[in-house]
């Protein structure tokens, strides 16, 4: 890449009809002359940028006292702080939805306690499963067969007995 760009020339950077006529090394200010003969100065330390008119008396209707190039401060409407924080709001909504989904998942995973209120038919009684119980041990302790337990509890899986759940047994 060359050291000089084609946009470093005055004719590319300055408004039409403007020429650079001087430079004050003490203040670092460039002076320019317009096609109508008026003089303009740039900002201190800036080669190009906002130009202000100098060296003449202002007439009542003359609005040349305004900067030649508009500044960026007046370029657009003032942006609200709410508009500036909009990406943060989007992030907050994403976090909120994630927490809501987590709460829903934990609520569903916990589920209702299926064995706490077992309704057993007449002639049977509920039995709460304790740690270490097996279908065989329950059948032996209540003098019934394993087939009788499975008949009264069709959804029972003897390999997966849940501690605290209830099953129905004959009296």
Curated annotation (Swiss-Prot):
A Pfam family the protein falls into: LysM
PROSITE patterns according to UniProt: LYSM
CDD domains: LysM
Domain of life of the source: Eukaryota
Induction summary: Expressed during in vivo infection of insect hosts.
UniProt comment concerning the protein's domains: The LysM (lysin motif) domains are small globular domains involved in binding chitin in eukaryotes. Blys4 contains one5 LysM domain.
Additional remark text: In plants, chitin acts as a microbe-associated molecular pattern (MAMP) that is recognized by lysin motif (LysM)-containing plant cell surface-localized pattern recognition receptors (PRRs) that activate a plethora of downstream immune responses.
Family classification: Belongs to the secreted LysM effector family.
Protein name: Secreted LysM effector Blys4
UniProt source species: Beauveria bassiana (strain ARSEF 2860) (White muscardine disease fungus)
């Amino acid at each position: 890449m060359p050291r000089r760009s084609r946009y470093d020339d005055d004719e590319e950077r300055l408004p039409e009809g403007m020429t650079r006529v001087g430079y004050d090394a003490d203040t670092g200010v460039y002076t320019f002359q317009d096609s109508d003969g008026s003089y303009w100065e740039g900002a201190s330390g800036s080669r190009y940028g906002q130009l202000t008119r100098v060296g003449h008396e202002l007439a009542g209707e003359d609005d040349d006292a305004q900067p030649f190039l508009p500044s960026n401060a007046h370029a657009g409407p003032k942006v609200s702080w709410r508009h500036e924080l909009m990406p943060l709001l989007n992030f907050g909504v994403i976090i909120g939805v994630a927490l809501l989904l987590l709460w829903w998942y934990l609520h569903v995973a916990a589920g209702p306690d299926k064995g706490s209120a077992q309704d057993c038919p007449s002639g049977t009684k509920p039995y709460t499963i304790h740690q270490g119980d097996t279908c065989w041990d329950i059948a032996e302790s209540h003098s019934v067969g394993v087939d009788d337990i499975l008949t009264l509890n069709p959804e029972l899986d003897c390999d997966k007995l849940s501690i605290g759940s209830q099953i129905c047994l004959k009296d």
